[in-house]
């Protein structure tokens, strides 16, 4: 409702995060849930870092709440009746949510080969004129011979070619057919470990590799862990922040996207979405407006409670 559709045909949505924060999990979780709801196929390109089996176990862990190591080892069968029932109960849902998911390892391929695979898959499996969600994990330099080009030039050309492919090359009479969601690593400015919230940089300056990534995308979000002080102040609002830094299209809740949020201490802050990451399962926990309302309610209750305390000073 705030930022509109993140999977508009012909558009690219980029998630920026440090390594290990959960950008792959977020993109795949979002794409597969949309796929299951609207019956749209998902093509997932992996850049040679995670196997198909690893992703399957992660998604199964997210749906069952059973630790990955139990699933990978097969010990879930020996972990009690409750665990066995949890795993078996989601088999049907797992097949339904991921029956339209296609995995392809493009590690070692140059950008032209990657786009060739995308086009061949689209025309052979999806069919001309039909919608496709394209999940690309993730933007980085390829192994091709780059000559005298800098890293930022190579990455810029990669994003440019993907944009032209989904915007211009593959389309029907009504327009583009492919929606793209991808991710990129942030630079060291985006590190949050051992930092207070006031010292964390939450803007597009943390995007690594090339400024063309920001230029060609329609939506850009920063995904990061909450700092220790944020977790202490916001205990019921998840473990991660999803912060929008660019939005070419907005949803019906425009105020939530562009207006600053007034906090109980009368300061103004940029809105963001709270996410709960637990065992590879992702749940939305409201936005900054919900945090402000919760803190205001708590402050009001404390003030009312203090006003009911009688004055015992008899002097």
Identify the function of each model-found stretch:
Residues 14, 103, 133-137, 181:
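Structural motif
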Residues 47-49, 182-187, 226, 248:
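A short beta-strand-to-loop transition that corresponds to the Sensor-1 phosphate-sensing loop
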Residues 74-76, 144-156, 193-203:
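Flexible beta-alpha connector loops of hexameric P-loop NTPases
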Residues 65, 69-71, 81, 92, ...:
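C-terminal regions of RecA-like/P-loop NTPase motor modules
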Residues 1-66, 89-93, 293-294, 299-302, ...:
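The Walker A/P-loop phosphate-binding site
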Residues 44, 135-136, 177-185:
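Structural recognition of the conserved hydrophobic beta-strand(s) that form the central parallel beta-sheet
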Residues 132-172:
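Helical hairpin unit composed of two closely spaced alpha helices linked by a short loop
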Residues 2-3, 37-130, 257:
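Cytosolic-facing regulatory segments adjacent to core modules
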């Amino acid at each position: 409702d705030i930022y509109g559709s993140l999977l508009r045909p012909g558009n690219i949505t980029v998630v920026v995060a440090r390594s290990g924060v959960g950008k792959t999990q977020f993109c795949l979780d979002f794409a597969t849930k949309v796929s299951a709801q609207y019956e749209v196929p998902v093509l997932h390109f992996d850049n040679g870092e995670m196997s198909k089996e690893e992703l399957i176990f992660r998604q199964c862990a997210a749906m069952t709440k059973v630790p990955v190591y139990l699933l990978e080892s097969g010990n879930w069968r020996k972990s009690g009746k409750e665990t066995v029932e949890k795993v078996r109960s989601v088999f049907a849902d797992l097949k339904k949510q991921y029956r339209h998911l296609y995995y392809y390892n493009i590690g070692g391929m140059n950008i032209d080969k990657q786009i060739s695979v995308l086009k061949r898959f689209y025309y052979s499996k999806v069919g001309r004129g039909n919608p496709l969600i394209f999940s690309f994990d993730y933007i980085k330099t390829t192994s091709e011979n780059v000559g005298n080009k800098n890293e930022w030039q190579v990455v810029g050309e990669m994003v440019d070619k993907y944009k032209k492919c989904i915007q211009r090359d593959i389309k029907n009479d009504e327009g583009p057919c492919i929606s793209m969601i991808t991710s990129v690593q942030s630079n060291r400015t985006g590190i949050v470990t051992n930092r207070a919230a006031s010292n964390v940089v939450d803007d597009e300056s943390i995007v690594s590799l090339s400024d063309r990534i920001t230029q060609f995308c329609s939506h850009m979000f920063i995904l990061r862990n909450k700092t220790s002080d944020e977790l202490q102040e916001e205990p019921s609002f998840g473990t991660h922040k999803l912060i929008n830094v660019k939005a070419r299209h907005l949803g019906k809740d425009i105020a939530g996207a562009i207006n600053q949020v007034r906090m109980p201490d009368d300061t103004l802050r940029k809105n963001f979405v709270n996410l709960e990451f637990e065992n590879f399962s992702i749940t939305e926990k409201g936005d900054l407006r919900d945090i402000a309302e919760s803190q205001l309610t708590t402050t009001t209750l404390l003030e009312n409670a203090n006003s009911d305390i009688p004055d015992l000073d008899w002097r």
